[in-house]
């Protein structure tokens, strides 16, 4: 597991986006802070740039005109254009100069080291919108709780400023991290992707045992857990998965269930990262199936919604 492995000081973390006016990451209008680094490797991940904890450069070949500017300004000589093809070798230190000088916008940086005060300065700009809409700030990723020292300090400062807090977590961290965050978190957005452990390893890269154990423990100390479930044909788009999930969460403090239909709108990000998007086994479930799954939760007394 990742644990506090970014930055020399406890109040720094690598963040790849601070998204304003989010309306799918908790109640009201929110600012979502996206942290880099995740212990999971979901095949459908819609933020693949979040998986690696380090800063990365994304390259869009379709926008690149091979002008050579990036090659000339790279102080590491990491960028080469040969035979009408641009490559970047491992000596790249992600300084971002190539991003700044690329007039075509073909290069993009994912990841910037922030202090807690840097983040507070950004999120406080939209305080009036939180107050008017009963919104707040959501910490997401990646997995924010691998940066627990930073996250705990940030959450505390948000609560000191009377700002509603949400933490979107995959649960694959030590329970101590969840416990530390829980003191200052109004709602947890907790992801459960697969109940079948073998499938969990196949599609996500690790066992689900820690994730399931942690939500049980979290339910004992926190009374506002929003369960979030991606629904993907070919992975978990079957009634058996829904039945097993309902059986598992019985007795837990689940305040709401969000069923998130699969999409592949992030496919282009994989290409920019030099990765292959393995979508041959995955597809979007029908509207009828999503409605049926929603009703299965509602029939057991849960408040359920399709989408975020």
Across the structure, where does each feature detected by a protein language model lie?
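Auxiliary Fe-S-binding modules of radical SAM enzymes
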Residues: 5-27, 231-308
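Short gly/ser/thr-rich secondary-structure transition/capping motifs
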Residues: 14-16, 82, 168-172
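N-terminal pre-triad scaffold of radical SAM enzymes
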Residues: 15-69, 85-94
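N-terminal-biased segments
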Residues: 26-27, 34, 52, 56-61, ...
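Iron-sulfur cluster-binding cysteine motifs and their immediate structural context
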Residues: 43-50, 69-87, 97-112
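Short glycine-enriched, charge-decorated loop/helix-capping segments at active-site entrances
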Residues: 61, 201-207, 274-282
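Conserved AdoMet/S-adenosylmethionine-binding subsite of the radical SAM
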Residues: 117-271
């Amino acid at each position: 597991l990742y644990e506090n492995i970014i930055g020399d000081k406890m109040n720094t973390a690598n963040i790849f986006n601070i998204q304003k006016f989010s309306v799918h990451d908790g109640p009201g209008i929110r600012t979502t802070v996206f942290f880099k680094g995740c212990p999971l490797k979901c095949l459908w991940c819609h933020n693949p740039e979040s998986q690696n904890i380090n800063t990365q450069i994304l390259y869009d070949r379709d926008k690149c005109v091979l002008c050579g500017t990036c090659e000339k300004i790279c102080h590491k000589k990491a960028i080469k254009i040969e035979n009408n093809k641009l490559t970047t070798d491992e000596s790249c230190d992600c300084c971002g100069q190539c991003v700044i000088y690329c007039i075509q916008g073909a290069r993009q940086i994912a990841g910037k080291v922030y202090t807690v005060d840097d983040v507070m300065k950004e999120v406080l700009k939209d305080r009036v919108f939180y107050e008017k809409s009963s919104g707040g700030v959501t910490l997401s990723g990646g997995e924010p709780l691998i940066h627990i020292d930073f996250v705990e300090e940030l959450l505390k400062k948000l609560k000191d400023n009377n700002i509603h807090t949400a933490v979107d977590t995959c649960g694959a961290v030590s329970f101590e991290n969840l416990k530390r965050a829980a003191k200052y978190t109004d709602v947890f957005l907790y992801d459960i992707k697969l109940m079948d452990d073998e499938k969990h390893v196949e599609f996500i890269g690790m066992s689900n045992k820690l994730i399931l154990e942690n939500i049980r423990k979290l339910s004992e100390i926190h009374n506002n857990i929003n369960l979030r479930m991606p629904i993907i044909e070919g992975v978990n788009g079957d009634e058996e998965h829904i039945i097993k999930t309902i059986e598992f969460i019985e007795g837990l403090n689940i305040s709401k269930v969000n069923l998130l239909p699969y999409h592949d709108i992030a496919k282009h990000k994989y290409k920019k990262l030099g990765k292959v998007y393995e979508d041959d086994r995955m597809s979007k479930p029908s509207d009828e199936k999503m409605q049926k799954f929603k009703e299965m939760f509602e029939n057991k007394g849960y408040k359920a919604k399709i989408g975020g």
